């Protein structure tokens, strides 16, 4: 079989992570030959699709599970997405402005919210505390049939919502608009990566072979499988977590409404989001449950699943530790029940009523075709879940395992990977141009984004 020409960099995976990297390499480096592989017929068919996520820009201002230090890093990395949307005139195309809030219910949560506002208001000076009088006119549904006192910490007129599929398509088009040799390989699945004696990489797809000097694998749950096939990352395993949503039958809220996080739970608390794919009707969720699939709504590849689970005594110990905690155990069982037809929304409505107390079961419909898979990485040596971005980087090849909300940090992760690839290939990264267009910094201003590992 004839091996095609050598590319400087190959990107495996056409989600928002892969597309943002393509954009960053094409626009801000002197790397000339880049190829991107996407096994489906369009980009962002899986977790970056607006049906598979909450369409949220996670800034750290209303996410109550973020510490102040984590919020500082998240704010800087997420600002790149917001800057791109504004600087490249993508408002109301890929990104949308609206209001958002963190809702506290009951005296204990209100006390916690006030303390959080005091701690975070310097980092996010636009945040406001909203009492019941304000909320009664601003979002009246929050108070209908409400017995407990409430308060919110919110922001008005921010970029809150992003269609990450359209954003991915925008990144692709901006890349193709450069003078670089960009090749997009749709409907082409990479099946194997090997390093050859000359140090270059051979990429075997289901149609042919290619060669590349460097590779970045942004393939969701499959990134770890590619790494382990090459002998890397054997200390990791994957716990595939699925998430589902419920729609209301009409638009009930104008704002994104997040709720206070239970510190014992590793997954996001319920939130309500106006959905850009459904005329801004309210979408509640997500649920979170273990699902024996690597890709939601796609065929099950049993061999890949078994390899990803990588079950041994260390992985089993992590599972046992999770089930030992009664709070997590109840949460897992409840979320599993919420997936059962007809019964599910009877259970889920009680969670949703924390946001809208007057909500009835008849107001909800299961969001068929919505939801995705989030590959949570297990560190077998430490016997714990890695709740954030995991990265393996060796000899010019990078494997990214980025669960939700990695889309928010995609441009920051792309910058980090671009710097690494440029160093490996002895190429140049135009930091000044990137600061001006994406980081929105003045000339020669420093950037603190050097290592965003475990930020998302």
Task: Describe these PLM feature segments.
Residues 96, 105-173, 177-179, 183-185, ...:
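Flavin (FAD/FMN) cofactor-binding and adjacent substrate-gating region
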Residues 17, 42, 222:
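Conserved Rossmann-like nucleotide-cofactor binding loop
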Residues 7-35:
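N-terminal Rossmann-like FAD-binding beta1-loop-alpha1 element of flavoenzymes
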Residues 317-432:
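C-terminal catalytic lobe of FAD-dependent flavoproteins
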Residues 257-368:
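Active-site lid/adjacent beta-loop-alpha segment flanking the redox-cofactor pocket in flavoenzymes
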Residues 54-138, 291-293, 297-303:
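Dinucleotide-binding Rossmann-like beta1-alpha1 core, especially the glycine-rich loop
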Residues 20, 193-195, 204-304:
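Flavin-dependent oxidoreductases
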Residues 27-50:
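Glycine-rich FAD pyrophosphate-binding loop
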